[in-house]
Amino acid sequence: MAILNNFRRALLALLFALLPLAAAQAAGDFIVLCYHEVESEKSGSLTRTAVRAGDLAAQFAWLQASGYHPVSLQQILDSRQGGPALPDKALLLTFDDGKKDVFTRVFPLLKLFRFPVVVALTGHWLNVPDGGMVDYDGVPIPRSEFVSWADVREMQRSGLVEIASHSYDLHRGVLANPQGNTQPAATTRVYADSVYETDEVYLARLRTDLRRNNELIKQHTGVPPRAIVWPYGRSNRAAQDLAVELGMPVGMTLEDGVNTANTALPQLKRYLIEESPSLQSFAEAVRHLWSPDPARSVRIVPAQWPLVEEGLSRTLDELQKLSPNVAFVDPRVTRNGQKAVLFPTTRLPVAADELNHIAWQIERRAGSPVFIDLPVDWLGDHGLLADLARHVNFAGVRIPRAPGDEHALRALNVMERWRWPLRVAYAPKEAVAADAWRRLRPGDLLVLPATAANLALVPAGEAGRVLFEFDPGTQPPAEIARAMRRLEADGFRQFGLAGFPDAGFDPVWSNLSLRSQPLLP
C-alpha cells in the first residue's frame, strides 16, 4: 500500500503540472463512465472494452487531480429528491459484467482513492457452478474469471460499491428475423416457429428475467438492486417502465453525453471507455473536448434492388468504403401496382419481412445508423408505427414535417415505447419557419435541399443542426462535389445524397466520406 501511495503522490504532482483543470459543469450535471475488463500490464492484445490496470490508475489520479468528484448512486438520488446538491464536476463510475478483475484490480484502487462505484452483475453468469464454463457473449470462459459472491459481499461491505443489475440472462442475442440475425435480447421480439413474440410475451420475458436477477442479488447481498444497467446499453421505454416498477428507478444506457438535472433517471447516459485510451484521450473525452462527427448521409431504397440479398451485399460494400453515419432507408416497395411494406404488420400489405435484416446488416457491417424514411400519411397510423418499432432495429426517423409538429411528436412517442432513443431528421416540404430551430431537440437535424435559398435561411450558430441534401439524379457528380467543398468552407459540415448512385460518383464519395478528411477543431 505504501508503494501505491507513493505512486499516487508522484502521479498527482505530474498531472497537476501538465493538465489544466476542466471547465465546471452546470449545477446538477454529472457524467457517467462505463468500464468493463481491467487487464494486467503484461496482457498482450486487449478486447475492445478492456483497459490496462496502469491506465485505470492513471485515469483515477487524473480525475482527482483535475477536481472531479466521483459520487455514489445514493448522492445522485438524494440530489433529485431535495437533498444536498451534487458537487461541481460530479462523476459516477460504473463497471459492467462482474469479471474477477473488478475485485482483484479495481477494488484496491477504489480503497486507495476512496472512489465509490457501481458494479453491474449478470446473474446467469454467476450462477454457473465453480469449475464450469460461462458463455460470455459467445466465448466460453471459466467461471473463475468472474467474481464470487464472497467477493461481491466484501466489496459491498466497504461502502464503496453498489451492486446493480445487468439482467439475469439478457446479455445475449436472440433470433430476430427469418434471415437468422441475432439482436439484443432486451429490445428484440424473439422469432421462433415463424412467429414473433407478442407484446404480452415479450414483456413477461423481461419481467421474469429482471425479477430473477433482483432476487438473486438480494439473496446473496441482502439488498435488492436500485439500478439496471442495460446490456449493450439497449432498452426502450416499456422496458424502462418495467424496471422502475420492479424497484430500479435508475437505468443506465450507452448514450454519450452529460446528464443534467432534467435527464430522466431511467435514461442515464454513459461514456463507454474503450481500447485502454491514452491519458490525453481520456482527459479530452471527460472534458467534452470532442465534438460529434458531422452527419453525412445517403438514401437507400431497397425497392430498387432486383434481388434483396444481392442488392444489400453491393450496398454494404459501398457503405463500408464511404462510412456515412446516417443511412435513410425507405421501408416501402410497390408490388403489382400496390404499395406494400417490408416489415410485419396488419395495417398495410406486407411484401416481405426484410427491413429488420436490412437495417441490422447496415448497422453491424457498415457501421451506419439507420433512419427510416416515414411517409407523411403514416404519421397518423399509430398502429403501423408501433409495428415498425416492434419489429425493426433502427436509430432514427426522417419525418416530412417541420420541427415541433404535433403529429410528428405523437408518432415519435408511439415508436419510442418499443424503440428508444430515436433521433429525428425533419425534412419539411414547406418553407422553414423562423422558430423551427428552437423546436429541434438536441441531436435532431433539419434536412433541407442544398440550394442557395435554403443556405440563406440558416441563422448564425445553427450550422450544426442542418443537413443539406443533394439530388444525384439531377446534379452532376462534379457539381455536387464542388458544392460540398463550398459548404464545408462556409462552416456547413453536414450534407448527404438523396439517393445511392451505383457508379460515376467517386468525386462525391471523397468529399462525403469523413475518412478522407482531416480532423478539424
Regions found by a protein language model. Name each.
Residues 293-297, 302, 426, 458-480:
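Active-site clefts of carbohydrate-active enzymes
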Residues 86-88, 101-111, 316, 332-374, ...:
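Aromatic-lined substrate-binding rim segments of carbohydrate-active enzymes
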Residues 254, 258-259, 325, 444, ...:
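Substrate-binding cleft of secreted/luminal carbohydrate-active enzymes
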Residues 52-71, 311-336, 387-396, 439-446, ...:
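Catalytic domains of carbohydrate-active enzymes, especially glycoside hydrolases
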